[in-house]
Amino acid sequence: MTLCMLSLVMMGLHAQNEEELWIKNGARNIYGVLSRPDNANKKHPVAVIAHGFNGSHAFGKNYFKTLNDLGYMCYTFDFPCGSVNSRSDNNTMNMSVFGEQRDLEAIVRYFRSQPDVDTANVVLIGESQGGLVSALTAADIPSEVSRLILCYPALCIPDNWNSRYKVLADIPDTTRLWNVPMGHRFFEEVHYLKPFDVIDRYKGPVLIIQGDKDRIVSMDDSRRAVAMYREARLHVIKGAGHGFRGAEQQEALEQIRDFLK
């Protein structure tokens, strides 16, 4: 068998372990992809991966192999209204941090209701805005989340936008961030949001990973979060910005592997 043919076979085997999965949250339909490990255990731990602002489920696939090798099922999804590329709902004018939190809670409860899931091992992994949403979710349903992984979490979102829109009357009907239109609702909600007042309600193990060249999220916020959580550590990736590439991503995955062993 040639190397090319072998690669195609391996890609096919990997694809067979992935399936599209829609999960409902009331009237909201959430699109995602579920990846299963190559073992026959009846119950598996599960990791739910939450993308950042204007991201998509595609970002979560970076975690599949590492987590599948550890025996985890992995679910990566598109937040409804969370991205112009969302297959769930791409109307970003309705983007909402609290809406995303409710969607993530619905996903957690879906998996906890499945017979092949080890309900004592449900892990949340959140990137950027998805990190904020994951932290809020873990604080709201702490007994349902076994471990929390935050990659460059945007805990700064309320402070950042409140410095721009100091009072509710300042908020326009439409704001564009990186050419993504966002409605009044998003900014009205975060105006009153104080993540550091609530995130420490989660008492389980926490891993925060961030690059020391991140220009979007302050390292001070991550250090503050680590100090607040009961059991947490911060891993800093030298030279990495807001998001990881290549060797940076591999370093992050190694940290996640060690954290979940």
Give residue spans per PLM region.
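Conserved alpha/beta-hydrolase "acid-adjacent" motif
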Residues: 215-221
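The serine-hydrolase catalytic nucleophile loop
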Residues: 53-65, 220
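Hydrolase active-site cap/lid region
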Residues: 136-184
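N-terminal cap/lid segment of alpha/beta-hydrolase-fold proteins
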Residues: 15-40
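Conserved alpha/beta-hydrolase
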Residues: 67-87
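Catalytic histidine-centered segment of alpha/beta-hydrolase-like enzymes
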Residues: 240-251
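Alpha/beta-hydrolase active-site loop
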Residues: 59, 94-115
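Short beta-strand/loop motif that positions the catalytic acidic residue
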Residues: 202, 208-210, 214
